[in-house]
């Protein structure tokens, strides 16, 4: 327990003494020895040595009304035997919370760049980021402004919007633009009984498919039962749109909700809505202890984005430990630094537990269930995650090019287990086992990918670190199965 307390104390002290904004450049060099460089089938697999050089920077800001982080890296990959595979890659993870008008105007912005799978039935991207025939670079961005102001008497008006962009390199599949605009009137003062009236407009436009749009007007009532730490809600209204058919349709909508927060560490949120595209629900259960975090969720919702990059799911290791460290550091910005330091100290990848996905060319109905748990001890950590999803075309009669072209539904499943142990204060070892599968009804729409990896590494002085990874991957499919063994050595320096 002393080590955990020292990690928290050191992280909090570092966060409190850090400047309002700072920039940390970095460079890294890695060498990968692989038995299957192009990952296009066991018969065609050839060994190779792949050199990756990366330059990047980390920007943090806690300057007053602007709170945010930006992590960017640019990599060049050189193949010793397959020069035609030489390429470049980018990674970006950025978020910004801006208060542009004191206590009234706010902006939430996010941006991501990363490798994503084109098909759920092909080889899924791995943590090493090596390209394959089924991966492409995807860029996503979201801007969500909000303004709140006094309307008349005790009534307030909230106007919000959201614009989301998804762009996949090398084609139009996965390229989409989503827009949402909402106006809400509600009482300024809160009490046991609450109400609101809201009008919204949302749309999705796919470059390789059709555009959809809907308008909705509804009213909501909520009732807080403080003795039970419970809040009940209900809504009813009207919706019109073309998300589920080629023609405009309309229907009445209604929904029920329940939020239960018996302790600061335990929460349950349940919602059910009957919408124009059908039934939707969102269930989320979470409980954390001083050393563990438990999550269970289920949802059925309309998805008008072309990419799954950054989508909610079982949660990455970073997401899990970010929630678990809430009692150690309540401030989100400082907690992010603490979690990153914890992951680095234990040799863990923050983006682990990534699920199976594919690029979409039309609006889909996503039905998914996720479970995850993470534990941290004095020198050990362990995490387990499971996720499954079923994707269907929101409009079954729509013709678009993606995995749903030849199958009415795409089913994916992901298991992942990671454990780590700190051998010494400057040496950590970890191991990960994962299973990913994708299934449809079309020819060749079935695959299973198993990955086993171990890692050892640690710091090289105050500003450098090293790691060695051994990986074994097995990809099973009727069309192009393959196996790969790889060893990866890397060195990173921060300035």
Question: Predicted regions span which residues?
Answer:
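Gram-negative bacterial Sec-dependent N-terminal signal peptides
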Residues: 1-15
């Amino acid at each position: 327990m002393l080590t955990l307390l020292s990690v928290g104390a050191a992280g909090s002290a570092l966060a409190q003494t850090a400047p309002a904004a700072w920039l940390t450049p970095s460079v890294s060099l890695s060498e990968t020895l692989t038995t299957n460089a192009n990952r296009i089938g066991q018969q065609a697999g050839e060994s190779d040595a792949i050199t990756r050089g990366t330059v990047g920077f980390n920007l943090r800001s806690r300057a007053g009304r602007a709170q945010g982080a930006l992590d960017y890296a640019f990599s060049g990959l050189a193949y010793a035997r397959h020069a035609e595979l030489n390429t470049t890659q980018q990674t970006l993870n950025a978020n910004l919370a801006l208060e542009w008008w004191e206590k009234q105007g706010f902006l939430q912005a996010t941006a991501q760049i990363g490798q994503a799978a084109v098909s759920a039935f092909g080889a899924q991207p791995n943590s090493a980021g090596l390209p394959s025939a089924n991966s492409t670079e995807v860029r996503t961005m979201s801007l969500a402004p909000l303004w709140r102001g006094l309307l008349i008497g005790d009534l307030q008006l909230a106007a919000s919007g959201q614009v989301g962009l998804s762009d996949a390199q090398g084609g139009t599949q996965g390229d989409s633009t989503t827009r949402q605009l909402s106006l809400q009137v509600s009482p300024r003062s809160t009490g046991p009984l609450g109400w609101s009236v809201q009008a919204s407009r949302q749309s999705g436009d796919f470059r390789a498919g059709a555009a959809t749009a809907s308008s909705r007007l509804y009213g909501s009532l909520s009732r807080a039962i403080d003795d039970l730490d419970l809040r009940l809600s209900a809504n009813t209204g009207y919706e019109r749109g073309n998300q589920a058919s080629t023609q405009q349709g309309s229907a009445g909508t209604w929904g029920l909700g329940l939020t239960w927060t018996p302790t600061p560490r335990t929460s349950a949120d349940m919602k059910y809505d009957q919408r124009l595209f059908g039934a939707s629900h969102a269930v989320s259960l979470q409980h954390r202890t001083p050393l563990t975090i438990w999550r269970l969720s289920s949802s059925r919702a309309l998805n008008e984005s072309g990419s799954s990059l950054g989508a909610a799911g079982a949660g990455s290791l970073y997401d899990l430990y970010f929630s678990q460290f809430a009692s150690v550091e309540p401030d989100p910005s400082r907690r992010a630094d603490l979690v990153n330091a914890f992951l680095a100290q234990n040799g863990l990848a923050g983006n682990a537990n990534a699920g199976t996905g594919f690029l979409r060319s039309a609006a889909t109905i996503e039905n998914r269930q996720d479970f995850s748990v993470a534990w941290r001890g004095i020198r050990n950590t362990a995490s387990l995650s499971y996720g499954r999803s079923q994707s269907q075309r929101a409009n079954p009669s729509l013709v678009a090019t993606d995995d749903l072209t030849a199958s009415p539904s795409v089913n994916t499943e992901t298991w992942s287990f990671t454990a780590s142990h700190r051998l010494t204060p400057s040496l950590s070892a970890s191991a990960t086992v994962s299973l990913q599968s994708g299934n449809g009804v079309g020819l060749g729409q079935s695959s299973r990918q198993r990955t086993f990896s171990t890692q050892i590494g640690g710091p090289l002085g105050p500003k450098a670190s090293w790691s060695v990874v051994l990986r074994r991957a097995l990809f099973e499919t009727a069309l192009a199965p393959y196996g790969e063994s790889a060893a990866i050595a890397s060195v990173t320096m921060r300035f």
